[in-house]
């Protein structure tokens, strides 16, 4: 189970600013948060060490590279215990940018980008469906992506946190 990290209001502000612009200078973040640049540096280091921040990355618009088809592929496995082996093979397909082990009818949900529908069909038929233990695939092509954002960085609590706080105050 993932570790839940308690973060204060300043940490929330830092994260919200960095999610919007990972290149924002620490001094600018410090001005926004009303603390020193050194405090921001220390807090970011602490958030990195705690695993809250796992790095910063440059985002590339797939369409700018001619990758005009975004597809989600639901994958059924003939043997669910072979999931790790299937993932090793899926990692070798550069068109796949994201993969999730999911509940329900399918075992894996993969997100991929292709040049066009012919490219997508080629990857599905000649690469993905030839991987051992992949029983079948079901493909959905994305027509639009009206929402694209990072994780929500606000003052949110787990559902049980409010009751714990209330009980401790009594």
Describe the residue ranges of each PLM region.
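A compositional/biophysical signature of low hydrophobicity enriched in polar/charged and small residues
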Residues: 1-170
